[in-house]
């Protein structure tokens, strides 16, 4: 029987069906799963956090190479499947929880202080999970993630393209990102309508950038892209970085214009033309001017 056939048989045996609300697409080919684990560079001393255990296609080859695997799985039916089958190695611990609600700090304590992540992400949580990884980057050395290819392309996009945006900048300023492979729909059950990609995110190798205020950078980037078709003067003025908007709309715009020009940029630019380095520069000058305003 083919891997695809075994997957369908296992699901039927346990009266399971892929759940759309969880974005479940089960990996069916053993060779592909092993290639993904290789991309994650799993070693014998590694404690791995897996997001989305599914039927264990990645879990088993990972466990054979790692010291321990903590598998986070939201679907109660999948948890029961593994309990009944007893198919996972002894060095696998399942965590029945929504990954977006998991306390990464608490989990890291179980994993020696760091979370090395490998994930087959449900398409519906790709962006929220990326932002959660960014938030906890100090305890996540690397993450190997399978997601929609179009999302992977956004994370790797260049300035001036329609794919370039908030996730590109906020992830790109704190990690190196590489696309390792592309997976066709036939690799999954059920078959998605789009291609998937595996990327590696290495938070230990961020680009060389000057020191910057991380929280303020996030605010500047999100504000700049809040209305993509508008100029950075209009979007950043609307964010009221300097004064409460209702009382000081004109003053806010004047200060924003002054700050953008002081950073060396034309106020007529749209956000997608600014590079990561440009946004870091803009953030630094915004911080300087905001501090002067408060004095």
Curated annotation (Swiss-Prot):
NCBIfam families noted in UniProt: ksgA
Organism whose genome encodes this protein: Desulfotalea psychrophila (strain LSv54 / DSM 12343)
Keywords: Cytoplasm, Methyltransferase, RNA-binding, rRNA processing, S-adenosyl-L-methionine, Transferase
Signal peptide bounds: none
Catalytic activity: adenosine(1518)/adenosine(1519) in 16S rRNA + 4 S-adenosyl-L-methionine = N(6)-dimethyladenosine(1518)/N(6)-dimethyladenosine(1519) in 16S rRNA + 4 S-adenosyl-L-homocysteine + 4 H(+)
Protein name: Ribosomal RNA small subunit methyltransferase A
One GO cellular component term: cytosol
SUPFAM superfamilies named among the record's database cross-references: S-adenosyl-L-methionine-dependent methyltransferases
Protein localization: Cytoplasm
């Amino acid at each position: 029987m083919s891997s695809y056939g075994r997957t369908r048989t296992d699901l039927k045996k346990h009266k399971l069906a892929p759940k759309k609300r969880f974005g479940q697409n089960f990996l069916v080919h053993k060779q592909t799963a092993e290639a993904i684990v290789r991309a994650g560079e799993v070693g014998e001393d590694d404690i791995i956090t897996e997001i989305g255990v599914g039927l264990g296609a990645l879990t088993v080859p990972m466990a054979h190479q790692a010291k321990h695997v903590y598998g986070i799985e939201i679907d109660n039916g999948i948890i029961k499947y593994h309990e009944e089958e007893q198919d996972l190695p002894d060095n696998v611990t399942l965590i029945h929880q929504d990954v977006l609600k998991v306390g990464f700090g608490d989990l890291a304590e179980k994993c020696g202080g760091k979370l090395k992540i490998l994930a087959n992400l449900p398409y519906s949580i790709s962006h929220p999970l990326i932002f959660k990884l960014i938030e906890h980057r100090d305890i996540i050395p690397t993450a190997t993630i399978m997601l929609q290819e179009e999302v992977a392309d956004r994370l790797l996009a260049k300035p001036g393209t329609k794919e370039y945006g908030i996730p590109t900048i906020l992830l790109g300023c704190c990690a190196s990102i590489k696309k390792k492979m592309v997976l066709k729909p036939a690799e999954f059950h059920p078959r998605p309508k789009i291609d998937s990609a595996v990327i590696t995110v290495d938070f230990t190798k961020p680009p060389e950038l000057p020191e910057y205020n991380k929280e303020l950078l996030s605010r500047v980037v999100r504000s700049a892209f809040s209305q993509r078709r508008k100029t950075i003067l209009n979007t950043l003025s609307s964010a009221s970085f300097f004064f409460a908007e209702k009382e000081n709309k004109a003053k806010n715009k004047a200060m924003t214009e002054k700050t953008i020009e002081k950073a060396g940029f034309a106020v007529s630019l749209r956000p997608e033309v600014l590079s990561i380095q440009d946004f870091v520069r803009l953030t630094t000058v915004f911080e300087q001017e905001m501090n002067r305003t408060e004095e």
